[in-house]
């Protein structure tokens, strides 16, 4: 891939993001580099720095905001996000179903929509910053305390009475929801998928983390946790969040049309310039404190009294001075003393890799190398489909067809692949069975075929029961329907809500067997498309007008509509 004349969006301008941008302007002439940071001050500083390095052909622009939030909340500071109504709005946003409107509300979608980058490089430490609760385990512990006080267990037959929802309970519940990284990361990746398809993003590279700098469960460092020693709950949560993100992106990598790469440094990423002065601990400035004379430590008194005595003995100055030390800033907004730096980068500990080396690996990956792409390595190491399994599949399907014929009962849907798959299989089966062959299904009058399909479902008791037994409704051409007592779609029914035409259309897309003429026409057009593609010799698909397999037909349809696994090299 050539980088000249490309628009490149870099999300995150910490050590790695900045180093990648510097390498880009040194090694190529992109049309535009967009730097997105979490804070406006950082954006202005990084863009100004890069403008001094970039050539005249490269435009440097910036944007800022919370990359995980809905766009209308992206510029809210963390203190503003502490507002109760804002936090509730965030929780509702992340936990609502991923409809198209929801996906287009996200900051990542808006960024790609606005700047139309050819390449996106995400260098944010997502595992550390994706949630909106400082201590998820404490928050969930508070929720657990509330759960213990609700009385007996809740069942469908006898729901337990929940306590009145006080503001405190609402806050604890909201905080617990915002501590869940999976919905937040899922919304981000799903919105990224939508944006990559809508705006033709050519490649996405994620720079991520092992969670422990390449160390294992024996890692002694808590990354600032003062409540635990060794591998803390906070660190385990970070590792889990990173794993969720990697798995989501790996599946996006297997999606047709999505070129996704993953680069992970497995060591402490280098450092900035050495300095002397105020420093931070756990992200906060360290205030100077002292206790110049010993105080008695009483075994029979609370520790809080001792702390109070210490503050009386050494009263704080009006302008509390900052503690100062020789230190060096490193990744994750951390600063390290000389001794800490020596320890953490020693052989056998985190060790270290320079930010320039990480940037070089990212650019190599961007240019097409797979040396540092973990997804390529995972694909290579994973066990793929085999010839033996294909032979056994053929034998198993033959046995199933023989049993179907012996019992004179079609085996179409069990419901275990979801209502939409079940709906598609049943519609195709009914359509082709009513027509008599694939050729007739493609060419018959749509109105006549809809009538024949409706008659088949009314007359074939076993087929009808197969649909209704798994919660599918059957929508007939004359505004009538067939339905059992339990419906899979919609999953929740409002007893007071009136059914609208829009509801029916929505439910029929999700999981109602739709035998109306418009849906029949949809399948006829797609069957013709399959026939044209197969006739062109582009596939090994056996197009037999009478001995067809409805599962194979639907698989072909999914392949043509982008709902198939990505084939390596394509």
Curated annotation (Swiss-Prot):
- List the catalytic activities from the record: (2S,3R)-2-hydroxy-3-(indol-3-yl)butanoate + NAD(+) = (R)-3-(indol-3-yl)-2-oxobutanoate + NADH + H(+)
Record's keyword terms, sorted: Antibiotic biosynthesis, NAD, Oxidoreductase
Among the GO biological process terms of this entry, one is: antibiotic biosynthetic process
Q: Does the keyword NAD apply?
A: yes
EC number(s) from the headed UniProt entry: 1.1.1.397
Give, as one word, the top-level EC class. Answer: oxidoreductase
- Protein known as: Beta-methylindole-3-pyruvate reductase
Q: What does the record give as the organism's lineage? A: Bacteria, Bacillati, Actinomycetota, Actinomycetes, Kitasatosporales
Q: Which gene encodes it?
A: ind2
């Amino acid at each position: 891939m050539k980088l000249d004349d490309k628009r490149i969006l870099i999300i995150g301008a910490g050590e790695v993001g900045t180093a990648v941008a510097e390498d880009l302007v040194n090694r190529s002439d992109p049309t535009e580099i967009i730097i997105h940071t979490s804070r406006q001050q950082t954006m202005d500083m990084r863009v100004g720095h890069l403008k001094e390095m970039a050539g005249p052909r490269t435009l440097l622009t910036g944007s800022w905001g919370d990359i995980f939030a809905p766009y209308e909340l992206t510029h809210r500071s963390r203190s503003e996000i502490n507002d109760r109504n804002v936090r509730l709005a965030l929780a509702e946003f992340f936990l609502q179903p991923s409809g198209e409107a929801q996906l287009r509300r996200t900051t990542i979608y808006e960024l790609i929509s606005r700047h139309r980058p050819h390449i996106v490089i995400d260098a944010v430490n997502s595992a550390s910053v994706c949630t909106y609760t400082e201590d998820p385990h404490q928050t969930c512990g508070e929720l657990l305390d509330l759960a213990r006080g609700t009385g007996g267990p809740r069942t469908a037959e006898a729901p337990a009475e929940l306590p009145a929802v006080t503001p405190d309970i609402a806050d604890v519940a909201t905080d617990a929801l915002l501590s869940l990284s999976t919905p937040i990361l899922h919304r981000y990746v799903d919105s990224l998928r939508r944006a990559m398809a809508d705006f033709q993003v050519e490649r996405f590279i994620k720079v991520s983390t092992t969670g422990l700098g390449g160390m294992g469960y024996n890692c002694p460092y808590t990354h600032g946790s003062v409540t635990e020693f060794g591998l803390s709950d906070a660190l385990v949560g970070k590792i889990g969040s990173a794993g969720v993100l990697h798995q989501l992106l790996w599946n996006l990598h297997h999606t047709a049309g999505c070129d996704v790469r993953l680069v992970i440094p497995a060591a402490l990423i280098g450092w900035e310039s050495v300095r002397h002065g105020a420093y931070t601990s756990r992200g906060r400035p360290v205030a100077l404190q002292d206790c110049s004379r010993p105080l008695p430590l009483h075994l029979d008194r609370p520790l809080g009294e001792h702390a109070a005595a210490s503050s009386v003995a050494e009263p704080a100055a009006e302008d509390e001075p900052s503690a100062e030390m020789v230190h060096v800033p490193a990744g994750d907004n951390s600063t390290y003393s000389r001794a800490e730096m020596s320890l953490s980068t020693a052989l056998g500990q985190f060790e270290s890799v320079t930010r320039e080396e990480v940037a070089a690996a990212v650019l190599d990956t961007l240019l097409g190398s797979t040396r540092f792409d973990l997804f390529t390595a995972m694909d290579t190491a994973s066990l793929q489909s085999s010839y033996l399994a294909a032979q056994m599949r053929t034998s198993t399907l033959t046995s199933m067809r023989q049993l179907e014929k012996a019992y004179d009962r079609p085996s179409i849907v069990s419901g275990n692949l979801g209502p939409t798959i079940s709906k598609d299989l049943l519609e195709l089966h009914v359509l082709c069975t009513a027509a008599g062959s694939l050729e007739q299904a493609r060419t018959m009058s749509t109105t006549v075929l809809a009538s024949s399909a409706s008659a088949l479902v009314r007359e074939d008791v076993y087929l009808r029961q197969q649909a209704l037994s798994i919660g599918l409704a059957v929508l007939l051409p004359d505004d009538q329907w067939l339905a059992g007592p339990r419906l899979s779609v919609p999953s929740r029914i409002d007893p007071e809500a009136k059914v609208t035409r829009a509801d029916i259309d929505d439910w029929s897309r999700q999981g109602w067997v739709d035998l109306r003429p418009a849906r029949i026409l949809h399948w006829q057009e797609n069957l013709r498309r399959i026939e044209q593609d197969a006739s062109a010799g582009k596939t090994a698909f056996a197009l037999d007008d009478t001995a067809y397999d409805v599962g194979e037909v639907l698989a072909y349809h999914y392949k043509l509509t982008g709902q198939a696994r990505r084939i390596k090299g394509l």
